[in-house]
Each structure stands twice: as structure tokens, then as C-alpha cells.
From Swiss-Prot:
This is Uncharacterized protein ZK1307.2. It comes from Caenorhabditis elegans.
Length: 127
């Protein structure tokens, strides 16, 4: 006699159905897209399976296994514009050219040169 037939016969004699056997286990595992099981086998037990992912980074359950930061310095600088304040003392419109805007921010005497025509060593960006 096969083992499964013997087992089902015993369960039938005891009075359990298959559904009752599986209902007795009240285990619910919630999964989402970000589940990361680097560092352990199934169900958190067993040998470690930490290693290198498809991008070449070493990962296990604890080291370097999280998502990248939502905001980094570069993403912040790329997303937010540089703020410039226009002190509207005399009812003039805000300047649209960079030179006048810098004169408003720092005054006409900027970087040691009166008048602020492009004498700044960083005028075209830092080299």
C-alpha cells in the first residue's frame, strides 16, 4: 500500500479532513516588492545566501541590503533651483540677467572688482 493512501486513511479514521489540517496552521506571510532575503535561506533559517547581486554589489540580510536613499545631495541639487531673493525696494521687476541678479545679491563691488563685469574667476564655473 502506498504511503499517501495509508496517511489519508488514517486521517479519515481520525476524523480530520485535509482542510482542517491546513486550517490549524495560522501562519500568514505578507510579501511586497521590496522583500529582501539576502543573508538567510527560506523563512529566515538555513545557510546564508549573501553574495553579489546583478549590479555587482555585495548584499546580505544586513550589509548593504536596503534601498538607495530617496534624496541624495546630487538629486537635491538637480531637483531644486537655486533660490535668489529680489528685494523689491523701488518697485522694479526682478532681474532676468545673471549679472544684475548677482549685483543685487552681493552689491556692485563683487570679487574685488567695481561694476561686476565678468572679472570673477568663477564666472564660467569652477574649472
Amino acid at each position: 500500500m502506498k504511503k499517501i493512501t495509508l496517511l489519508s486513511g488514517i486521517l479519515f479514521l481520525i476524523g480530520y479532513s485535509d482542510a482542517e489540517v491546513f486550517e490549524s496552521q495560522n501562519v500568514r506571510v505578507k510579501r511586497n516588492d521590496f522583500t529582501n532575503n539576502y543573508g538567510y535561506g527560506p523563512f529566515g533559517i538555513g545557510p546564508t545566501n549573501g553574495g553579489f547581486d546583478s549590479y555587482g554589489f555585495y548584499r546580505d540580510k544586513f550589509y548593504n541590503s536596503g534601498l538607495p536613499p530617496l534624496y541624495s545631495f546630487a538629486s537635491y541639487r538637480n531637483y531644486y533651483h537655486e533660490i535668489s531673493f529680489h528685494k523689491n525696494k523701488y518697485g522694479q521687476p526682478a532681474p532676468t540677467d545673471f549679472e544684475t541678479l548677482q549685483q543685487e545679491r552681493y552689491g556692485p563691488y563683487y570679487d574685488g572688482v567695481w561694476g561686476y563685469a565678468d572679472h570673477s574667476k568663477n564666472w564660467f564655473g569652477k574649472r
